Every structure is written in structure tokens, then in C-alpha cells.
Amino acid sequence: MKNSTLLPALFIGVAMALGLGSLEGSAVQGILPYIAGGLSTSSDHALWTLTYFIVHWSLGITLMPWSTARFGARRVFQGAAAIAATGTLVSALTHNLWIMLLSRAMEGIGAGLLVPLSQSLFLRHSPTARHGMVTMLWSNAMLIPFFVGPAIGGWLATTLNFRFIFWLSLPLWGLAWFLGRTGIPAGGENRDNPPFDLLGFGLLYAGLMALQVTLDQGEQYGWWHSFYILHTALAALILLLLFAWRESRAPHPLLQFHFLRQRNYWLGLLLLCLGWSLFMGWAAELPLWAEETLGFNGYWGGVLLLPIGLAAVPVSTLMDRLQGLFGLRRLATLCFLLFAAAYGSGYFSPQSGLAEIFWPMLLLGLGLGMLFVPLTMIILSGIPAEDIPKAATTSNFIRVFSANIGVSLISVYAIRDGALASNAFREHLLAYGNSSAMTAPTLAGLVAAQANTLSIDNLLRLSMWLCLLAALMAYAFLIPPRAIVTPGSPRSYVEEAEEEVAPL
């Protein structure tokens, strides 16, 4: 293990970089109208600054195993921090949407490299007996910015300018780069490393970008009524199928899909993606709805998400103890029951305030605090220790990209359902007449507010039923890790962690 005097620099620098990557993704969630104004575009197009960050965040994850083996952990960390900092600088300077999307892609690539790299460094430079605690610290470093980022971004956007999100991040990236360079040991380069799967990466990149265009622009062009969207969707399908075929035959693939043959891996990953994508989708949609319908500014729209962090952080710190008391499968089930309770208890009106939104968000935070540790350990259960980095890279890629699907689909559903409700209200007014003394613009505003809120409530009910189904699947079909351990099987981090917290 590395000299213990340099470990604080390693942990602080790596955690700071990981948190900054998450912060730059989350800080824009509640200020899309402000970004739209700064870039002279619409809020729908401003949403691309979030979705393009996420898609490149997931792509960055696939680069980490090969680049670390080829260049060493320290050089990869420095490169990732430098790429993200460069993107941050361009984001702070540009007034053009397309240049902003390019800079957000750079930020996403850098942040994506840091996700599996930071997890690997944390586990490699800590005792085995502390792996459970280190995993909790790693997940908090990644998640806490998602809770506080929207409020920070909202405050900066309303008091200064949304570009200060990027200006203030720049010196922190520099500090993280310096601490990481000081704490991460040099070496680890392997010039005989197998060649990078450039063809596979090209197919994956092109496929994900075609899928992203379909998700982002489908509503604008009328979905399947548009040949443009049909062609981009077909291109995405063909390219991603070619990528899967390529990975199954490549001697050194980017992603290892054969792990999906294990029940705990694919089912645990499916549940993790569902919980994470729903959270990310609502974290983007609720602040936007509050600003456009309730009249909140960017700061108060971001404050809506703070109760999630108030509950999630304390619960996540107790996961070492809770998994020993209840077991991983029961915790995963309870997580989705809490999600269902949060989405089911959220019933809003155009007159709702923070008090009505606080308790559903608090319940959501309780569930989110239980999401990562039990499902991550279930996903990795039964996998030999030497294969865990490959399995974790594949699962992290799929989980991160699932957030993009959640953000896009929840946004599209809210828009479409709101439009349907608005049309129904207008037809009712035309049929029965307007007996009030309201002017036409005032009445139109009330109809839009009611329709948008009804759409949010319907989507909350749908999310509740999805989480209830997920809870049933978790309890009925996940296999507790202890049940699949066989005598003489290769030891893994999951087995060790299970033994450490086993109740007396």
C-alpha cells in the first residue's frame, strides 16, 4: 500500500474531482430557462446541455480500463481532470449552443473517466476490512453534488450568472489535479497493453449519439411521423447491434456483456437503472415544473431537491450496519417501497409550495440512500475478484446512460400529457362556455398551469407503480449473495463485505 502520509491527498483529490464531475452535471438541472436565455435558445434545447453531458459521461467510463492499463492511474486522472477543466472553461465563455454542447461533452468524458477510476483507487488504497465504508464514501462523493448542485446552480444563476457555476469550478479542478498528482502513485503503465478497440468505440459512440438525437428531437419532429426520426432511430438500433456483435467477438472488448448471463447481475442492474433513471428524470423535471408553473426562481427550484440529500446522506452512512441487520435483498426491496411511497404521496396543485413537496422528496431521499450499496453488492455477487473491475465498468456504463433515458422520457411524457390535458380543458371550456370574468390570456395561463400539474401527478402515479413492481421483483427474484457462495469459490469483495457485517 502507498505511503500513508500521502493517502489524504489521494482520497481528497480524487473525491473532489469525482464530486466536481457530478456537480457540473447536476447544477444545470434547475436553471434550464436561465441557460436558454444565455444561449438564445429554448428550454427544450437547453435540456441538451444536461443530456449530452450524461451520454459522454457514460462513454468516458468505457475508456477507463484500457487507458489506465496503458498510461497508469495517475496520468489518466490528470488527463481526465484537465479535459473536464478545459470543457468547464469553454462552457463559461461560450454563448453558442453547439459550442456549449461540445464543451459539455468534454466535461462528461472527463467525469466519466473519473467514476470507475476513483472507485478503483479508493478500494486499492484501503484495507479490505474498510471496503464497505470506502464504497459508502465513494458513493456519497458522487451523490451529494446531485442533491446540493441544483440549489447552488440556482443561487448563482439568480444572484450572479449561471456561468459562475463553471468559473467557480475551475480553481477546484486545479486543486483536485494537484492533490491527485501528489497522492496517486506513479507507474502502472504497460506499453504492451492490447490495442484499444477503436472500431467498437466508434460504433458505440455513433449509436449512442443517434439514440440521443432521437430522444432529444423526437418530440420536436413528431416522433414516428418524421422520416428524420425514423432514420436516426433505425441508425441507432443498427449501430448498437453492430457494437454488441463486435464486443462478443473482439479479443479485448470495451464492455463485457457476458456478465449479463448471471441473474443477480442483469436483474440487479435493471433495478439499479430503474431507480437511478427515475431519480435523475425527476431531478430535472421537478425544478423546471416549479419554475414554469409555480413561479419559483432558479434557486427555489433547486432547493426542492435538498430534502433528498437530508435523508439520503445519513441513510447511506448506515448501510454497513443495515445490510448486516436486514440483508441486501430486503434492503433493495425496502428501497423501492420507499420510492413508491415517495412518488405515491406526491400530489400537487398549481398552488403547491415547498411544504407540500418536502415530504415526498424526503421519502425519495430515504430510498435513494439505500439504492447503491445493496444493489451494487448484489450485482457483483458471484463474480470472482479478478473480474470485478470489468463487471463494474460495464454496470457503471449502463447505469449512467440509463439516466439519460430517464431524463428524456420523463420530459417527453410530461410535455405530451400536459398538451393532452390542456386540449381536454379547452374543449370543455368551448363546450360549456366561460362563465368567469377572466380575460382570455389569464384563463389560458390557468389552463396551462392545471394541465402541466395534472401531467406531473399522472407521471408520479406511473413512477409509483413501476417502483412497486421493482420491489416485488427484488424480493422474489434476487438471490441473496450468501446463498450463491460455494465452498472453494474465488473470494470477492462482496463475500468479504458480507462476512464483515454478518450479525452475531
Model regions: which residues?
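Flexible interhelical linker loops that connect adjacent transmembrane helices
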Residues: 2, 129, 177-205, 220-225, ...
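12-transmembrane solute porter fold
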Residues: 7-23, 28-32, 41-52, 58-65, ...
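Helix-loop-helix hairpins in multi-pass membrane proteins, especially solute transporters
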Residues: 61-199
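Short helix-capping/hinge motifs at transmembrane helix termini and TM-loop junctions
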Residues: 94-95, 127, 183-186, 215, ...
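C-terminal membrane-cytosol helix-exit motif in multi-pass small-molecule transporters
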Residues: 170-189, 205-217, 235-249, 470-481
